[in-house]
Amino acid sequence: SPGISPSDKLLKSLENSQCKLTTDIEIVQSMTNTKFICVTGTNGKTSTVSLISDILNENSISSIACGNNGISVFKSLEAKYDYIILEVSSYQLEHIKYLNAYISVILNLTSDHLERHGTLDKYLEIKLKIFKNAKYKIINKSLDYEDKYYNFEVKDKDFLVNKAKINQLSVTHNNIIFQQTHYPIVGYHEALNLCACLAIMNILNLPLENIMSAFSKRNLMQHRVEEFISINGTKFINDSKSTNAESTLNALKSVNGNIILIMGGDKKEMSYKMLIEIINNKVKLLVIIGENKDY
């Protein structure tokens, strides 16, 4: 289980006894020939695997989104799929010895889970394990490894895959525009998620028209900048899927008006300095709760 730390004493004793240790992902891979598209990153994993699966299924390419998104990878064995879209966390990658992906994607990397991994360098090392044995390797161009891998980025208003502009497609603060049609988005980070999908679909030779048709019907993630009620002009937005400073920053960028921000949760070894400017500029009242309220 990814919930067990590699430093756990029982785990160490099992390793020393030469007992064979494996993971659910490795078991499933040994039982199926279905191709895996594996996605990791500090933020946006669940939204992106859901979008990839939506696009494929909409185009009669059967797939299931599973893994760290709450749907067991074993669920993928219950039917025949063309692709298994797997969300993989750093905790899962830490234990995996052999991952055989058709396409692997790293969406982004920022400081997170250092209470488990110790250092940022170690965290990056674990995330890069997703590329081992992958046939196609896709990475956000903002990272330092882009020259080694297939890459994607959103630059100004343009979508670029391997530095080539995706024609007829552009992005504004709250819309993606394709052939003069505006597709609302809940934040600029959703444009980056789409760009990662474009890189994947480029490999799979899926036409842009088909991708955008599926994107227009996408299932938005619950609890991700989710407006759940409005009272007397005051909107209540649930972004409890944001579990670090970077994702909170993206959420705040996507919201306008006077903001009352309630934030806090489990204590994590991370800096919140990136939030200072936007909180000073946009947040009317800040309420801090949880274990990390004094951090």
List where the protein language model places each region:
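Phosphate-binding loop of NTP-binding sites
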Residues: 2-149, 201
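Short, glycine/polar-rich helix-capping loops at beta-to-alpha or helix-loop-helix junctions
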Residues: 7-9, 270-273, 292-295
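Beta-strand->loop->alpha-helix junctions that form or flank phosphate-binding loops
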Residues: 22-27, 140-141, 147-166, 187, ...
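Residue-level signal for inorganic ion chemistry
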Residues: 39, 68, 87, 107, ...
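Cofactor-binding loop segments of dinucleotide-utilizing enzymes, especially the Rossmann-like FAD-
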Residues: 42, 68, 264-266, 289-291
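Nucleotide phosphate-binding/pyrophosphate-handling subdomain across enzymes
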Residues: 62, 180-284
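Short internal beta-strands
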Residues: 138-141, 262-263, 282-291
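Acidic-glycine-rich active-site phosphate/pyrophosphate-binding loop
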Residues: 161-180, 221-227
